[in-house]
């Protein structure tokens, strides 16, 4: 009787241990599932954090690029403002120079015109500016007691011999040839400056040089 009870008690203990093992295995399985789920969630969180970090780094890179671009633009605008200011100053200085040059040119032109008027009155000579620079055309008036004598002239500006002959003829009539030559030269200069061709014709350039040579050479 005692032996039967002992076996029954043993079986109960074995059964209890078995059931406990079953519960432990069940709990272990649940725990493993929870650990796996936790690891899966943790992995998802890590991946999400990595993606977020990549986005943050990308945004930081964009922000840095935008900041550098903005700094470059600010620097460029500063340089541009300096260049604009420098250009304004240069333009003002240029306007002042042009104004001074125009004023000096007007003064010089007034002096020349006054000189031409004086020489024209002194020599009694009128030079047709429309004919210049190709031709030296005009008239010299010799004042007389009874009547005035008109001496018209119309020569090719390159006709050095004709100009010399005219100078000799005027000199024989007691005309101040030196002043006459100065008058023609001044009128020639004023006319050519007024027309101011960008590329002076070859004939005009030659005619001016010949007249200058003729006017500076002594007359007999």
From Swiss-Prot:
GO terms for biological process: cell division; meiotic metaphase chromosome alignment; meiotic spindle organization; mitotic metaphase chromosome alignment. Residues 41-119 form a coiled coil. Belongs to the SPC25 family. It comes from Drosophila erecta (Fruit fly). Component of the Ndc80 complex, which is composed of Ndc80, Nuf2 and Spc25. This is Kinetochore protein Spc25. Acts as a component of the essential kinetochore-associated Ndc80 complex, which is required for chromosome segregation and spindle checkpoint activity during meiosis and mitosis. Required for kinetochore integrity and the organization of stable microtubule binding sites in the outer plate of the kinetochore. Participates in SAC signaling that responds specifically to disruptions in spindle microtubule dynamics. The NDC80 complex synergistically enhances the affinity of the SKA1 complex for microtubules and may allow the NDC80 complex to track depolymerizing microtubules. The lineage of its organism: Eukaryota, Metazoa, Ecdysozoa, Arthropoda, Hexapoda. It is found in: Nucleus; Chromosome, Centromere, Kinetochore. Keywords: Cell cycle, Cell division, Centromere, Chromosome, Coiled coil, Kinetochore, Meiosis, Mitosis, Nucleus. Its main location: nucleus. GO terms for cellular component: Ndc80 complex; nucleus.
């Amino acid at each position: 009787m005692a032996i039967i009870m002992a076996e029954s008690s043993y079986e109960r203990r074995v059964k209890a241990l078995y059931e406990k093992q079953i519960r432990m295995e069940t709990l272990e399985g649940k725990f493993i599932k929870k650990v796996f789920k936790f690891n899966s969630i943790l992995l998802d969180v890590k991946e999400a954090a990595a993606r977020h970090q990549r986005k943050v780094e990308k945004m930081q890179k964009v922000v840095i690029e935008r900041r550098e671009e903005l700094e470059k633009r600010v620097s460029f605008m500063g340089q541009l403002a300096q260049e604009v200011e420098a250009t304004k100053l240069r333009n003002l200085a240029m306007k002042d120079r042009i104004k001074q040059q125009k004023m000096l040119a007007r003064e010089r032109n007034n002096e020349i015109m006054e000189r031409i008027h004086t020489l024209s009155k002194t020599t009694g000579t009128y030079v047709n500016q429309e004919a210049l620079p190709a031709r030296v055309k005009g008239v010299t008036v010799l004042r007389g007691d009874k009547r005035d004598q008109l001496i018209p002239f119309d020569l090719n500006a390159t006709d050095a011999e004709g100009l010399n002959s005219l100078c000799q003829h005027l000199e024989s009539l007691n005309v101040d040839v030196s002043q006459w030559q100065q008058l023609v030269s001044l009128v020639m200069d004023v006319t050519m400056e007024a027309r101011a061709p960008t590329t002076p014709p070859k004939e005009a350039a030659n005619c001016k040089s010949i007249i200058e040579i003729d006017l500076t050479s002594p007359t007999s």
